[in-house]
């Protein structure tokens, strides 16, 4: 028997699979399809780390199993290669982003191929390929044509390091999601996408899909639907300020108003305002703060009272003061709030600081001491005609009253904001629009797509916030497609999220030059049957791609309103000390090192055996070694092989149980228990002393999705017909998974004293008879009289003695 040599057999089988196109999906519409998808990676300079193979292997296991079950499986791979990380790396190391991308993709691909993933490499895509981003640009033009892409002067999140505008979703704890640098507010003309137009459908259609519950909850919370009232407050100067509130029942408790420092009424009412200089100074200070700093709950409350104008509370008719404060943002609601300090902590703290009245309107607390916020239920007080009502009844009553008086209207609001789509950087898809003084913004004709990203020597971001492309006058200056006059190209580029918002569609028809993908292929392959990805992308990529897909559905391009039928997520792999892997901690594990020392099958097996797939788990080098020993034991089963195509009779029940367990566990992401059941079966084979060819074929087929190289090699070495990739998945016999005997505990006066093996069919009388016929067991009650006996079928035999 040859020694197990992973290096030799793994490269051999990887070459065979690729040369024969074993994992190439066909467009044979007569076969039932299975489209498995993992998030395509950003190819970083560091290459793969051991966290990458975990989700890749998981869906590889499912894909390999589904192929053996007869499905036409599409399991593709590509590269999300545009974006800030590549550009920042290129600037730092003085290498062009295009060169960086090519080098990184080549390294990533080599690493992935070395892991034996069953990707269909014939469908490989790259978001930086002009033949790919041609269709990203095409989708943008469709959004523009439908009025869902618009340019607007607005206050945006600005990363001080990347020098680029960020969407709200890209700001984490006041810092840039990519680099961690401070994020400030800056006025900028930006392209926006109206994702808010799809807010309701993005919530409702979650009922149509099989996502893990916490993903659905995160998406709903991010969209932030609320139902309330828009209420008009008359103010000095004959104007009205409209506020949005979900608690109109607390209107009688509104003792002051707060508006955003950027509110346009400040300029419009300047003639009435007596302390304009104070307001302008406060606004300048607020502009220096990020949105995170401004809205942080624990920060000190600051503000300035607007002298010279007041508002009228429409419920009480009383005059109330108006303040500006940085915790109110123009980008949320109407840029104004009615403050109810009795029942809102932030309003209460503000009222205390500025010595403003605090009125209790929902009974239950002591508003002199703190805001009473447990007000979802309760009795209304100090509120005139809604006094004594429950909160729910009071909401309805005052809402109707406001509508009747023309003082307000019911409104559904969303926390979700439109998507900031411009990036003032080089390494991204050019936005296919030109600006003409006569015609405004004009789309580049589809026949001229793609608008190629020009080759440049200097791609550093500019200090004035313009894209590096703005300096390329030969490229910028062009002709208006509409009137033939002078025009200039848009110099902002798209965000990294653009290419990843539709990539899964291109996999269905990656070489199509005439359309995004053929209707025939989209109708066959979509929607995706199973998509696995990180929880960190729930409010970014997952939301954006669902939005684009719904838009394309409305355009008649795709056949389904949702792109992903099922979405699962995986836990991180941590360092051995339970800390997140990072270069600074020196605990990063390179998968190449594991493959070199132990083999790809060992790495794959370990990552599936390491623990609950959905939870984060620490790396263990000893665990890796244990998995290698397990594969060695499988290899050595050759030594006890006997020439029989039947299953070992004595182990037949265990084999059928293992088939059932592995089949079900692979589909429910319980890879660790599936592997454990195969380990137990191998122990049975060694304990028995022989393994038949029938046993071996079953074991190798079950293990193949996890450890494909060693199983294919053993299949060939043992002279079995064909290859595992051409065989069929084993089917268990349910009758053979049921034990004919069971071991039950014997409990005497409440304490377990022994065990007995009985037939599963035994009645209580038969159990009693077997107990009395066993001298060893009868010794447990010797000298005592049996008072009572209770048999719980298949579970326990209780005896009471005295």
From Swiss-Prot:
The keyword Aminoacyl-tRNA synthetase applies. InterPro entries: aa-tRNA-synth_I_CS (IPR001412), aa-tRNA-synth_Ia (IPR002300), Leu-tRNA-ligase (IPR002302), Leu_tRNA-synth_edit (IPR025709), M/V/L/I-tRNA-synth_anticd-bd (IPR013155), Methionyl/Leucyl_tRNA_Synth (IPR015413), Rossmann-like_a/b/a_fold (IPR014729), tRNAsynth_Ia_anticodon-bd (IPR009080). It comes from the Bacteria. Gene3D superfamilies: 3.10.20.590, HUPs (3.40.50.620), Isoleucyl-tRNA Synthetase, Domain 1 (1.10.730.10). GO terms for biological process: leucyl-tRNA aminoacylation. One of its GO terms (cellular component) is cytosol. It is found in: Cytoplasm. Its EC number is 6.1.1.4. A motif ('HIGH' region) lies at residues 41-52. A motif ('KMSKS' region) lies at residues 580-584. Keywords: Aminoacyl-tRNA synthetase, ATP-binding, Cytoplasm, Ligase, Nucleotide-binding, Protein biosynthesis. It catalyses: tRNA(Leu) + L-leucine + ATP = L-leucyl-tRNA(Leu) + AMP + diphosphate. It holds the Pfam family Anticodon_1. Its main location: cytoplasm. GO terms for molecular function: aminoacyl-tRNA deacylase activity; ATP binding; leucine-tRNA ligase activity. ATP binds at residue 583. NCBIfam families: leuS_bact (TIGR00396). Belongs to the class-I aminoacyl-tRNA synthetase family. This is Leucine--tRNA ligase.
